[in-house]
């Protein structure tokens, strides 16, 4: 189990990312449209104004069940340990153990 403080920190980052998503996207679109370098620098300044934790690269995908940050499978939202346990217990529909 991940520490609860880390999970809450990640939730806060997700809220910030959703809040500033439109500002970042519009600034990046403006940069590609503006031909002059001085105007681009001004827009880069706007990109630096939102908080650091609002950047999408600061987010980390976590296991839905345990909060573990590593070995996550996007399709299920689970880490490898829990995924294996759930497949063995036949709790995930459509997922089977491989055998050859």
From Swiss-Prot:
Keywords annotated in UniProt: Plastid, Ribonucleoprotein, Ribosomal protein
Entry-linked InterPro entries: Ribosomal_uS14 (IPR001209), Ribosomal_uS14_bac/plastid (IPR023036), Ribosomal_uS14_CS (IPR018271)
Record-annotated membrane-spanning stretches: none
Keyword Methyltransferase carried by entry: no
GO molecular function: structural constituent of ribosome
Pfam families: Ribosomal_S14
Domain of life: Eukaryota
Residues annotated as signal peptide: none
GO cellular component, one term: plastid
Subcellular location(s) per record: Plastid
Single biological process term from Gene Ontology: translation
Quaternary structure annotation from Swiss-Prot or TrEMBL: Part of the 30S ribosomal subunit.
HAMAP family in the record: Ribosomal_uS14_1
Family, per entry: Belongs to the universal ribosomal protein uS14 family.
Function per UniProt: Binds 16S rRNA, required for the assembly of 30S particles.
Stored PANTHER family: 30S RIBOSOMAL PROTEIN S14, SMALL RIBOSOMAL SUBUNIT PROTEIN US14M
Protein's UniProt name: Small ribosomal subunit protein uS14c
Gene giving rise to this polypeptide: rps14
């Amino acid at each position: 189990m991940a520490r609860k403080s880390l999970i809450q920190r990640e939730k806060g980052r997700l809220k910030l990312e959703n809040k500033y998503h439109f500002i970042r996207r519009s600034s990046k679109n403006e940069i590609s449209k503006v031909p002059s370098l001085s105007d681009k620098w001004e827009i880069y300044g706007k990109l630096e104004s939102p908080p650091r934790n609002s950047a999408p690269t600061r987010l980390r995908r976590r296991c839905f069940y345990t909060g573990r940050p590593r070995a996550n499978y996007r399709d299920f939202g689970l880490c490898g340990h829990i995924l294996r346990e759930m497949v063995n217990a036949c709790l995930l529909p459509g997922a089977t153990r491989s055998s050859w």
